[in-house]
A protein has these predicted regions:
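Secretory targeting and sorting signals
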Residues: 2-27
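Beta-strand-enriched cores of mature, soluble protein domains
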Residues: 27-163
Length: 163
């Protein structure tokens, strides 16, 4: 090896050491990116005090997803003109590679007809994740409905995610 190459190699060691030390810091402080999910499927009352959701859809950063959700802990909502339900709404989104995100919303779902309940501008947070989303965090807004007449639901989540 020539003397110039040896000197260049030694001179580059501090740079390599700096990059190796900084890399975990950069990965741990992920920048929030847009997060959007559109899901739909079947749903209805599982018991008088719980609702289920089961479906699929598409999500930015996740791709195609399957969805399993519940709404529980019902109490009457006084903020809806036609009545509504305060509830704990949880959705488990599973990506094709098996990675998951659990989204939680303490929301108010308002009756908009005798058979349709709607959640508009309901805040959510990303509670947990697995696989490539193991350390994910994020927040945003849920908009969705459950139509009891035909047992269907549809919803969107829009916000940000860091992982």
């Amino acid at each position: 090896m020539s003397r110039k190459l040896r000197i260049a190699g030694v001179a580059g060691l501090p740079l390599v050491a700096t990059l190796l030390v900084a890399a975990p810091t950069v990965a741990a402080s992920a920048t929030p990116v847009p997060f959007f999910v559109s899901i739909s499927g079947v749903g209805g009352f599982a018991t008088p005090s719980s609702v289920y959701f089961q479906g699929s859809g598409i999500a930015l950063v996740m791709g195609k997803v399957t969805d399993a959700g519940t709404a529980t802990d019902f109490t009457p909502a006084t903020t809806c003109s036609a009545g509504g339900i305060n509830n704990l709404h949880t959705e488990l989104l599973t990506a094709a590679d098996g990675s998951t995100l659990t989204i939680v919303s303490h929301d108010v779902a308002c009756w908009v007809s005798a058979t349709r309940i709607y959640c508009a501008h309901c805040p959510y947070s990303i509670d947990t994740g697995t696989g490539r989303f193991a350390n994910a965090t994020g927040t945003g807004e849920l908009n969705g409905y459950l139509e009891l007449a035909n047992g269907t639901f549809a919803g969107t989540y829009s916000g940000t995610i860091s992982f």
